């Protein structure tokens, strides 16, 4: 069934990201399935190949769900899609027109899925940072980020998995001014797969605006009462994301989930 779903994606034009949601019994099976997905894409897509992520969370009403991100080229503007690698061989896509550049990255995770959440988060964010520096961008250029966290609400040594992730995210995000607000973001739990990050970053002549929801408090100003951590060595970091992000020149709105 997975190959049938993936084959349907090959027929789409300008596919830039594939995200496969499925059930895994443990992290060993997760790594096996992730390797299968990466090898399948390498065999069946020509460059520029889409970035790929495997999310170890069974869909509610199916065994597999494939999320496909593709581009529609505007008739009045040419764009290029190039497959790029960092110095440490982290793969990503660069999309460019005459007035803007967008980075599509996915599947960013630690090499060892058995490390503590904090260490896994640091390794994943270092890969994000490496891509951004390669493109002469910074964290403030990220407009959309997807965060998939194994057992997101588990408590270890008094600290919640999600809070440990937020603390690391806060440290890396501190290097940027965030003049256009934090990214729109997804933060969901998974059964396995460690810490996994996808992101889109944009720079150039584009108008980027953060979006609020009057019915919700902004996540990045949550109070300590809703943040679960007992670390004495660090201040609790809030979830750094906006409820949405508008990239108006691209007629695009990213909604947080």
Region roles according to the model:
Residues 2-3, 118-132:
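Short, hydrophobic/amphipathic alpha-helical packing segments
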Residues 4-15, 132-141:
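Phosphate/pyrophosphate-binding loops at sites that engage ATP/ADP/AMP, CoA/4′-phosphopantetheine
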Residues 8, 40-41, 110-112:
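Conserved "HGTGT" condensation-loop signature of ketosynthase/thiolase-family condensing enzymes
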Residues 19-26, 143-151:
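Acidic helix-start/capping segments at beta-turn-to-alpha-helix junctions
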Residues 23, 27-73, 157-202:
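Short, conserved loop-to-beta-strand elements that form functional interface hotspots
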Residues 73-76, 81-84, 190-194, 198-248:
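Surface-exposed beta-loop interaction hotspot
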Residues 89-105:
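Cyclic-dinucleotide signaling modules
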Residues 253-257:
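Conserved small/polar residues in nucleotide/adenosyl-binding loops
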